[in-house]
Amino acid sequence: MTTPGEDHAGSFYLPRLEYSTLPMAVDRGVGWKTLRDAGPVVFMNGWYYLTRREDVLAALRNPKVFSSRKALQPPGNPLPVVPLAFDPPEHTRYRRILQPYFSPAALSKALPSLRRHTVAMIDAIAGRGECEAMADLANLFPFQLFLVLYGLPLEDRDRLIGWKDAVIAMSDRPHPTEADVAAARELLEYLTAMVAERRRNPGPDVLSQVQIGEDPLSEIEVLGLSHLLILAGLDTVTAAVGFSLLELARRPQLRAMLRDNPKQIRVFIEEIVRLEPSAPVAPRVTTEPVTVGGMTLPAGSPVRLCMAAVNRDGSDAMSTDELVMDGKEHRHWAFGGGPHRCLGSHLARLELTLLVGEWLNQIPDFELAPDYAPEIRFPSKSFALKNLPLRWS
């Protein structure tokens, strides 16, 4: 990446593709290779996609030029997208306030409770002999554990998931339905009431503590944080549960290895998240002219940073299209990088390690349903399997 403001555009050829035509639904390896092969900057559907490792990592580390706020805070929306749609120094404050609640030390205190819920959820499935893993587990599991930590009632889980699904569907439709609008309103009303209740009657949960600490978040900030976590904060675990169980169903030798050596589950989880991140790109908007891959992007250019393409770019032995199970946890960028690196990465790893370990404990051998062909929902902002039918005896 060239220094911002330098102009070396010259005669640059800008590839133009249609996002929906990329072969992502069946094979992300082929899809991201198609994009990388097209060029370092590819224009699709109004966005400039950066596909090369050097450029993606430089942009992730430079929020001054590649702004999250301009990309993620909807104009005119009074609800702040905390902390995602803020750049330093505002983002630095949010990170400082929130980080302690998602640190390994804090999560270790919650581990017994999270483990109990994990065991119970898989136990409810194990006796069936079959399940549709996305609907029966992947969509529910991260929500249930989130509610435990965050301080929302467990009995509201399914209602919150329903609202979340409706609001996300609304964002993908050109014209929202009355039901979509009603769901969005009901979710906001629910969260407003819960934030106010925790402010009046605080407990040990995250929702209470962020409102009463040394530097408490305001009511509107907590509402924005809660709204973001419900709508977009849990997709990584949902997607990774599905892809983890898919790979384990395909690979009996891998199942046996992880049962015999549970410490390798962490390696497996890192590889699943590297290969199949639910949020494969990071949106940004440039704040000043910047030259990338030979092209000068003017200020105000909408950009998407393709972390998933970087994770599979073949630049080293660990950045391949295959699981690398060599006993080591290799670095990747599925959780982003720079100041906006995923705040919940430790929680995601913990949840996935618990789930895979307990699944193999209760359901050691299982297989895919006959004639099943895995596909993700595409085009979509979040990559996850449409469904995952499993069976066992």
Model regions and ranges:
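Cytochrome P450
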Residues: 1-393
